[in-house]
Amino acid sequence: MTQPIVVAALYKFVTLEDYAELREPLLKAMLDNGVKGTLLLANEGINGTVSATREGIDGLLTWLRSDPRLVDVDHKESYCDEQPFYRTKVKLKKEIVTLGVPGVDPNNAVGTYVEPKDWNALISDPEVLLIDTRNDYEVAIGTFKGAIDPKTETFREFPEYIKANFDPSKHKKVAMFCTGGIRCEKASSYMLGEGFEAVYHLKGGILKYFEEVPQEESLWDGDCFVFDNRVTVRHDLTEGEYDQCHACRHPVNAQDRASEHYSPGVSCPHCWDSLSEKTRRSAIDRQKQIELAKARNLPHPIGYNYKAEA
C-alpha cells in the first residue's frame, strides 16, 4: 500500500539574526529527508509548507527543533495521495509574511491566542468583531459564518483597510483568523500597535480548527484555500473539488469550468476580461507546454500534478 504524503504547514515568529547562514543547512536537511516545498527565512522567523513521507517530515521537524529557538515551532498536518510540491526551496525574505509596516513584531507584542476548542464560543459573542485576514480569492470559497471580508488582494492592503473601517474606541473586541495562524498573528500585533486592546486570533489557524473541531460542531462554511496543488481542503482535510486558474490564481469550481470564459491554464470567469495581452500569450504558451508534456507522459513542466479532467 502506498504511503500517504504528509503536508506540514509550519511557522514561528522568533528572532533569527543568522537567518541567512541557516539557508544552506536547512536546504540540506530538507533534501536529506526527501522533503519538497518552500520554507521562508527572515530575521523575524520561519514560515512555509512542505511535504514528504511520515519519516521525512518527522526528520525535518527533528532537525528544526534541535535549534533551541525553534524547539516549539508550530505545525499542523494534512494528507494526500500524491506530492503536492515538486521543488525544494529555502528563500531569504525581509518578512516571513509581508505586511509592509515597519516595527510590527509579534516577537514583542501579539494578541491573545485562542485554542480551536474555544473559538466557537468567542466568535458567537455578538460583541466580537470577526475579521478574515486572508485575500479575497481565498475568502470567496469559504469562511467562518458572520466573518467580515476585507476584500484585500494582498496582506499589504490590510493596514489601510483597518484604518479606514475600524476605530479602537468603538470596536472593543476583535477576533481574526487565517489559514495556518501566521497572518492573523502578525495582524494582531499590528492591531495592538494601532490601539485596539482586546485582540484575539485563532491559534494554528483554520487548518488546526479543522483538525481539532468535529465537523458537526463547525461554524465554517465552504472549503479552505491552501497554497499547494490541492487548491482547497474540506473540513475533514481531504482535497476539495476546486482547480486553480494559473493566470489569476483564483480557485475555479465546476460552474466556472463550464463557463465560455474558462480556458484551462489561460483564463477563467474571474479574469478573462482583465488579462493583458502579454499575460494571455504567456499563459497560452505555458498551457501548450503542459499539454505536450502530459501527452508524452513527462513530468509537469512547472511542478504541479496533472489533475483529472472535470
Curated annotation (Swiss-Prot):
A GO BP annotation: tRNA modification
Disulfide bond positions: none
Family annotation (PROSITE patterns): RHODANESE_3
SMART domains: RHOD (SM00450)
Active site: 178
Function in brief: Catalyzes oxygen-dependent 5-hydroxyuridine (ho5U) modification at position 34 in tRNAs.
Protein name per UniProt: tRNA uridine(34) hydroxylase
Naturally occurring in which organism (per UniProt): Pseudomonas putida (strain W619)
Gene name for this UniProt entry: trhO
